Design a protein with these regions (language model features):
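Long, low-complexity, compositionally biased intrinsically disordered regions
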Residues: 1-148
Length: 148
């Protein structure tokens, strides 16, 4: 988990690199920019993969960075072998005890979350719908699967 703190007296967010001790800051209201910079510093492979997704599908920018938040908080459990149609379990960011199953249905990824179920999740030009949970599983596979 990235530890980004808010300094009320300075009215800024701060992130300290655990390896180098370097301190990154961002003004109040810009926590998302500091988060992106911290990810780029600590996990360049994840940062680059997120940028590639966004470059190819700009409509996925918001859910991509939410997916990165999930990954950096160790919220993705991808199964080595699918359990039925379930490929992964991904934490809910709104319910601390909730997890969503990411599965395959008719060759496409599906999620149990409200965003995906209500057809509100963004659609790519290829016609695929992506919520943050599906993208978290995808980015985890792209950046983590070969590391173990």
């Amino acid at each position: 988990m990235l530890d980004i703190q808010y300094d009320r007296s300075a009215r800024e967010y701060r992130f300290t690199d655990p390896d180098s001790g370097e301190i990154l800051t961002a003004p109040s209201g810009q926590k998302h920019q500091l988060f992106k910079a911290a990810v780029g510093l600590l996990d360049p492979a994840l940062y680059d993969a997120a940028l590639r997704v966004i470059e190819n599908n700009p409509q996925l920018e918001r859910v991509t960075w939410k997916a990165v938040e999930i990954i950096t908080s160790d919220g993705v459990e991808v199964f080595p072998e699918p359990r039925g149609d379930v490929q992964a379990m991904v934490i809910s960011q709104s319910d601390e005890y909730g997890r969503y199953a990411v599965s395959t249905e008719d060759g496409y990824y599906a999620c149990q979350c409200e965003h995906w179920q209500s057809f509100a999740a963004p659609i790519t030009q290829q016609g695929n719908r992506y919520c943050k949970h599906i993208l978290a599983m995808y980015l985890w596979r792209v950046t983590r699967e070969d590391r173990f």
